[in-house]
Amino acid sequence: MLRLLEEKIATPLGPLWVVCDEQFRLRAIEWEQYRDRMEQLLNIHYRHEGYERVSATNPGGLSDKLADYFAGNLAVIDTLETATGGTPFQREVWQALRAIPCGQVMHYGQLAAQLGRPGAARAVGAANGANPISIVVPCHRVIGRNGTLTGYAGGVQRKEWLLRHEGYLLL
């Protein structure tokens, strides 16, 4: 049975749930107000193998590392390991998201083209929306083709804050 360690941490944007496995690979990061979404994704991805969730304090130093990110050490999120469920296509999109440099953005069509699927912008958007590891798998760095801030499960205000925090200048 998969054992998931979880902790709720304080951030400038509100409480954030951090969930990892016993090897301290992130399995989920989600804002408190969207905890139901996180629980649905955990069930979708891990119910077949069975899992239990256990309260933990700073598992693997992950909570401290996320606090460091919010304090300005932006590069720390690139060092964090993830282990996600999802379809092969979703995992491919999530891996591509991690390659978008801090302070930069892409639109869904650019990301689809980068994956060799230029007609799959909507599918990329759907995979982006199913991302279980907010911030570390930086789905907030994907914007609409016309530059609008669209499609962040944590809310557009948080997306804007994260992009500004990372140095992306919004007009």
UniProtKB/Swiss-Prot annotation:
Predominant localisation class: cytoplasm
PROSITE patterns: MGMT
Cellular compartment(s): Cytoplasm
Catalyzed reactions: a 6-O-methyl-2'-deoxyguanosine in DNA + L-cysteinyl-[protein] = S-methyl-L-cysteinyl-[protein] + a 2'-deoxyguanosine in DNA; a 4-O-methyl-thymidine in DNA + L-cysteinyl-[protein] = a thymidine in DNA + S-methyl-L-cysteinyl-[protein]
InterPro entries, alphabetized: MethylDNA_cys_MeTrfase_AS, MethylDNA_cys_MeTrfase_DNA-bd, MethylDNA_cys_MeTrfase_DNAb, MethylG_MeTrfase_N, MGMT, MGMT_N_sf, WH-like_DNA-bd_sf
Homology family: Belongs to the MGMT family.
Function summary: Involved in the cellular defense against the biological effects of O6-methylguanine (O6-MeG) and O4-methylthymine (O4-MeT) in DNA. Repairs the methylated nucleobase in DNA by stoichiometrically transferring the methyl group to a cysteine residue in the enzyme. This is a suicide reaction: the enzyme is irreversibly inactivated.
Descriptive protein name: Methylated-DNA--protein-cysteine methyltransferase
Gene name linked to the record: ogt
